Amino acid sequence: MTNRTYRVTEIVGTSPDGIDQAIRNGIERAGQTLRHIDWFEVTQVRGQVKDGTVEHYQVGLKLGFRLEDD
């Protein structure tokens, strides 16, 4: 196994369709600008309520991505 070094960044993924989709949306979007994303950690879960029903989900994530070797 090779030694790896990771950088960690925090994002918030959102979705009206649920927590799972908010995670997927956040990772998919981050993957457009970050390479080598290997793991995530959920740090927060919250949502927006409108007229007594859940309107939108927000999930705070830490993403770990590998630094490239020279």
Identify the meaning behind each predicted range.
Residues 34-38, 65-68:
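Glycine-rich loops and low-complexity Gly/Arg-rich segments
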